[in-house]
């Protein structure tokens, strides 16, 4: 299967190219990046595009894939609402897999967090803490947002009504039902996430630590193979994994 990697010069892109070249089922049709020495376009016989680049790069790239009928896998995070609308429009014409995290472990965690939130209820305060390397550009991480949304789902509340991003100053006592997200940055951390359920007499913590970008790249390559031949629509990594 011929795949194109968008953002091929980046941390994730380099890992994707390396793993795709090692796979007997995949062929790298194009390594696309704005960096010098990289391609700007994929060939017409490309069978899937995997995008781990920059939020503003996604709309023009996915629009081109939609015109050509090529499935698209989005790993890039931090999309604005307008950019997300462009993705949704493309998904009416091609299969699109979009996930803030392609690792098996985090996708399992999403289900565990939903169950925990439902079981423990709003008496347990939910705080999501994430840490990433100092080069990460968006905050909080797409994964932290997905985890916080899973907690909101488990409680049956609308995430936007209860979300809080960090705290500073005289914020007052913590109201019940809030779901707060905190982003730490430093060093070379690949991606750590903890969801805390803090009760009055006990605390439950669910943690995932990615040790290598291989965890994300393997999932994205699997998603590209899964997407080929699907009906147009927007899918998540949970669909790919059947979770
Ligand atoms: N979903 C996941 O599992 C997952 C995992 C890790 C990272 N990410 C996300 O993937 C993205 C990339 O992460 P990274 O750590 O590899 O970043 P990075 O900065 O190392 O790489 C991004 C690459 O994209 C390139 N790029 C920028 N604009 C472009 C354009 N218009 N066309 C083509 N290429 C362009 C840059 O030149 C760079 O080489 C980020 O949004 C990050 O949050 C997602």
Question: Can you annotate each of these PLM segments?
Answer:
Residues 2-44, 122-243:
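C-terminal substrate-binding/catalytic lobe of Rossmann-fold NAD(P)-dependent oxidoreductases
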Residues 34-36, 77-80, 101-102:
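Short, acidic/turn-prone active-site loops that include or flank metal/cofactor-
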Residues 42-50, 66-72:
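Short acidic/histidine-rich motifs immediately flanking catalytic phosphotransfer sites
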Residues 53-54, 77, 183-185:
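Short glycine-/small-residue-rich Rossmann-like dinucleotide-binding loops
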Residues 63, 67, 76-96, 107, ...:
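Rossmann-fold NAD(P)-binding glycine/threonine-rich loop
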Residues 71, 86-103, 121-126:
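Rossmann-fold dehydrogenase core element
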């Amino acid at each position: 299967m011929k795949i194109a990697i968008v953002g091929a010069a980046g941390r994730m892109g380099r890992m994707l190219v390396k793993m795709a070249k090692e796979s007997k089922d995949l062929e790298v049709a194009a390594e696309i990046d704005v960096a010098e020495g990289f391609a700007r376009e994929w060939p017409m016989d490309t069978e899937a595009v995997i995008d781990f680049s920059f939020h503003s790069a996604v709309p023009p790239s996915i629009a081109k894939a939609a015109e050509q009928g090529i499935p698209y896998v989005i790993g890039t995070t931090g999309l604005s609402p307008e950019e997300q609308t462009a993705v949704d429009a493309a998904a009416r014409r091609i299969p699109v897999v979009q996930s803030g995290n392609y690792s098996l472990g985090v996708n399992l965690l999403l289900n565990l967090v939903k169950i925990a939130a439902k079981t423990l209820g709003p008496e347990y305060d939910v705080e999501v803490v994430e840490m990433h390397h100092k080069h990460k550009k968006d905050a909080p991480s797409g994964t932290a947002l997905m985890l916080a949304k899973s907690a909101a789902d488990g409680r049956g509340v609308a995430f936007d009504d209860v979300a809080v991003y960090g705290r500073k100053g005289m914020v007052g006592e913590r109201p019940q039902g809030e779901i707060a997200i905190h982003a730490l940055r430093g060093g070379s951390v690949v991606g750590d996430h903890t969801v805390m359920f803090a009760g009055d007499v006990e605390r439950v913590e669910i943690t995932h630590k990615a040790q290598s970008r291989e965890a994300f790249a393997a999932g994205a390559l699997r998603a590209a193979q899964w997407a080929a031949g699907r009906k147009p629509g927007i899918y998540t990594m949970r669909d790919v994994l059947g979770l």
